[in-house]
Regions:
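Conserved HGGG/HGGXW glycine-rich cap/lid loop of the alpha/beta-hydrolase fold
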Residues: 27-83
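Short beta-strand/loop motif that positions the catalytic acidic residue
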Residues: 229, 235-237, 241
């Protein structure tokens, strides 16, 4: 993977498949990131899921939102092409994200957090409320949420299942095993391979384990007072999320003062990828 320091005032690419990878030094970490879409307006910062690097974002979702908004994605500390040791708490990851955002010179952003990224987004909104304008939380849950402390077991089980069946574990973790779910998984994984040049580094086993510990701790924490989150929030999930149980999305919607909830039928953790066309439409209407 080739990374370059981002030039000031660089033109933004509007295709995720060809968006160049840049780096920026912030807080002693060299963060790898990509950006595309319009050069003006409030940017949407994407916060990644467990074990994810830049190339794990669905091109249809990125390009869809980038059609109207500047999109910025980055590798968490210690993941992919970003330097440093992977944090073992969601709190540290949230601080890293704020450091990265401020290093790019932004005073206000929108956040799209998927799974672990949604946990990070919640903390940013609580700790740095002036930084966040709006927030999309997909396939995620609050601190102490139902079944979140079981993500480690489910992840290891489905990783082993993937090895035994020679399939990508995301087929089991993100999608239902119905005909619709299987078809959506196949299409999603094919889209992840559309970018052929300048691909990111896969996450290391050490980083993966550190992230699992962070999620486990999040699942065991005392519930936070989400009434303090005053920003508009779009909560999205599949009706059958077995990784971060769907009840957590319902709980978020109930506890957040200004939220709306979308649950996709016959869909699991990766509902936003299975129903990417509808999700992008709703996201653009919300942002």
């Amino acid at each position: 993977m080739t990374t370059v320091e981002a030039p000031t005032g660089a033109a933004l690419n509007t295709t995720w498949q060809n968006a160049p990878t840049h780096t920026i030094n912030a807080g002693g970490v060299q963060f790898a990131y990509r950006q595309l879409g319009p050069s003006t307006g409030v940017p949407v910062v994407f916060l990644t899921h467990l074990a994810a690097v830049l190339d794990n974002w669905d091109p249809r979702v990125v390009d869809g939102i980038a059609a109207k908004h500047r999109v910025i994605t980055f590798d968490n500390r210690g993941a992919g092409a970003s330097s440093g040791a992977t944090p073992r708490t969601i709190e540290e990851m949230a601080r890293d994200a704020v450091t990265f955002i401020r290093a790019l010179g932004f005073d206000q952003v929108d956040l799209f957090g998927f799974s672990m990224g949604g946990m990070i987004a919640q903390l940013i909104a609580q700790e740095e409320p002036q930084l966040v304008r709006k927030m999309i939380l997909a396939g995620t849950g609050p601190a102490g949420g139902e079944g979140i402390d079981k993500v480690t077991r489910i992840s290891y089980q489905d990783t082993a299942r993937g090895l035994l069946t020679r399939r990508d574990p995301k087929e089991f973790l993100f999608f239902t095993r119905t005909p619709n779910g299987r078809g959506a998984a196949k299409d999603f994984l094919a889209r992840l391979e559309e970018r052929t040049n300048d691909r990111d580094k896969a996450i290391s086993v050490r980083s993966f384990r550190a992230q699992l510990k962070a999620i486990h701790r999040w699942g065991q924490q005392a519930p936070a007072d989400l009434a303090s989150v005053r920003q508009p929030v779009l909560v999205v999930n599949g009706e059958r999320d077995r990784m971060v149980p769907t009840q957590n999305s319902v709980d978020l919607d109930r506890r957040l003062p200004d939220s709306r909830l979308v649950l996709y039928p016959d869909a699991g953790h990766g509902g936003v990828f299975q129903f990417h066309e509808d999700f992008v439409k709703r996201a653009l209407e919300f942002l």
